[in-house]
Every structure is written in C-alpha cells, then in structure tokens.
Amino acid sequence: MPEATDLEELKRGTDLVKRGFARMQKGGVIMDVVTREQARIAEDTGAVAVMALEAVPADIRKRGGVARMPDPENVTEIIDEVSIPVMGKSRIGHRKEAEILESLGVDMIDESEVLTPADDEYHTDKRDFASPFVCGARDLPEALRRIREGAAMIRTKGEAGTGDVNQAVKHQRTIKTQIRTLTGLNHEEREKWAREHGAPRDLVHETAEAGRLPVVNFAAGGIATPADAALMMYHGCDGIFVGSGIFGAEDPEAMGTAIVEAVNNWDDPDELADIASGIGKGMKGQSNEDLPDEEKLQGRGV
C-alpha cells in the first residue's frame, strides 16, 4: 500500500488526475465568490465548487482599471470556510499569479480573460503545474490550443459580467458545429483542417473520433437565470459557471438554489417553471450588442 506522500503525489499532477478532478464537477454549478460569506451561501445553495476572485465580472466592468488575482488572504479564508473545492482566477500569461494560487492550495486555476491579460501573446504553460486549469474558448481551435497547453477543463467565454447569455450560446454552438464537421472528415482532411485552423493535429483526431472535446466543457459568460443555465445544458454543456448572476440578483440564496435545481432538471419544463417562480429579480445585465468592441472581454487570449 502506498505511503501517504505517495498518495498525495498520485492525487495531483498527472493529466489523468487533473482531468479526473474536472470530470468530478460534471452536472454541477460553480459560483463566483468574493468573500467567505458568499462562499458559505454558494455551498449552502448547492454549488459543487466556488471561484474566488477580487470582484465579480459585472463589478470589474463598472470600476475599470486593472483586474488581478484575488488577495491570497481572502483565498485562504474562503478555503477555510467551505468544504467544497475552491478555484481561483489568474491573469492570462501570468505564471506567478498561477504559482501563488497553487501554493495556497486551490483545487483549480482559471486562466481567465475576465482579468486583465499579463501577456498578449502567450498563455501560461499549464503542463508545468500540479493543479488543474480551466480556460475559456470561443471555438474548437481555441479550445484545443488550451488543452494542448494543459487545460483540464474548457468553458465557453461568453461575455462575462453582462447577464446576456447570447455569446455563451454562440460559442457552444460553434464548438459543437466544428466537432460535427470533423467527424465527417477523413484523416487527410482532418490534417488539413488542423493546419488551416492552427489546432493541434493529435487533438483534432482525438476529438473527431470521440465526437466531443477530450475534456469536460462547461458554460460560462452571461448566465443569469435558471432558464439560462437550463439552456446551456440543453446545448450539451457538462456544467455551469455563474459569475455575477448569483450575487447580482435580488435574492442570491434563492437564485443560487434555483440555478442548481435548473441544471439538475434542465429537460423538464414543468419543473423549470416551478424552480424559476418567486425567486426575485435577476441581475440587471447589459446586452452584448450594446458593448463597444473595446469593452468585450471574450477576444482576450486566443
């Protein structure tokens, strides 16, 4: 039987284990939290994990400036507060933020376009870390590039902080359509597709043969209601990230519980109607169409 230190090494570090942890979150809701009190609410309403950050995306948009990783002390407080996994956001290409989060003991790192990118050319090489990473993607080539770098989970980018699910739907549909295209191509055509789209060839073949991404694929970016969450599950997502939609709502506890229940009952309209009733107003939101291009976050880190 392995020693305790061996068990710890087995628990973290390999691609198999990293992807395994990500798969354990399937069918669940991961909620953004800023404080330990919010983390407690998230756990009590049924979140499978929480994402620690310095401000929810809607507030990041309002205040402007440079958005960075959360205060390490705050991350530690959140870890101590809840029994569910705690994730943390780092800036794109900011290896040191990721290293700090790993040293704090977070269960997963989100290399996130919501924060101000530290590097306009390169993402962090996630293969060097013991902790699993999640990254956003708008299409299949982008998703496969992140997986090649070591991402254990992909999420739609959507347009975070808007409460408008439109772009999350677009990104998920795009990925699904491109996968369907690949499944109908022969080996040589897939090789050509990989070259033309800047996608890793081996992952292109793996995706085509499996008919899905090699890692779990969650929805994120603009999900603000139980119906939004159910819609993304209908479109084939493995789970849901909710950022501003919980604590930007009139009643965060009711909204959090309802979104969790909607994910569990996404294919039952009668149940969804009951779930969505009497939970108070959702976040105000902002239409993606009204955003100037320079304020859109989804184009960061391709």
Swiss-Prot record:
Enzyme Commission number, as recorded: 4.3.3.6
Domain of life: Archaea
Gene Ontology MF terms: pyridoxal 5'-phosphate synthase (glutamine hydrolysing) activity
Listed name of the protein: Pyridoxal 5'-phosphate synthase subunit PdxS
Assembly: In the presence of PdxT, forms a dodecamer of heterodimers.
Cross-referenced Pfam families: SOR_SNZ
Catalyzed reactions: aldehydo-D-ribose 5-phosphate + D-glyceraldehyde 3-phosphate + L-glutamine = pyridoxal 5'-phosphate + L-glutamate + phosphate + 3 H2O + H(+)
SUPFAM superfamilies membership: Ribulose-phoshate binding barrel
Catalytic residues identified in the record: K89 (schiff-base intermediate with d-ribose 5-phosphate)
UniProt binding sites for D-glyceraldehyde 3-phosphate: R173
Disulfide bonds: none
Pathway assigned to this chain's UniProt record: Cofactor biosynthesis; pyridoxal 5'-phosphate biosynthesis
Region described as Disordered: 278-302
Lyase found in the keyword field: yes
Keyword terms of this UniProt record: Lyase, Pyridoxal phosphate, Schiff base
The family this protein is said to belong to: Belongs to the PdxS/SNZ family.
Name of the coding gene: pdxS
InterPro entries, per the entry: Aldolase_TIM, PdxS/SNZ, PdxS/SNZ_N, RibuloseP-bd_barrel
Binding site for D-ribose 5-phosphate: D32, G161, G222, G243, S244
CDD domains (alphabetical): pdxS
Single GO BP term: amino acid metabolic process
Physiological role: Catalyzes the formation of pyridoxal 5'-phosphate from ribose 5-phosphate (RBP), glyceraldehyde 3-phosphate (G3P) and ammonia. The ammonia is provided by the PdxT subunit. Can also use ribulose 5-phosphate and dihydroxyacetone phosphate as substrates, resulting from enzyme-catalyzed isomerization of RBP and G3P, respectively.
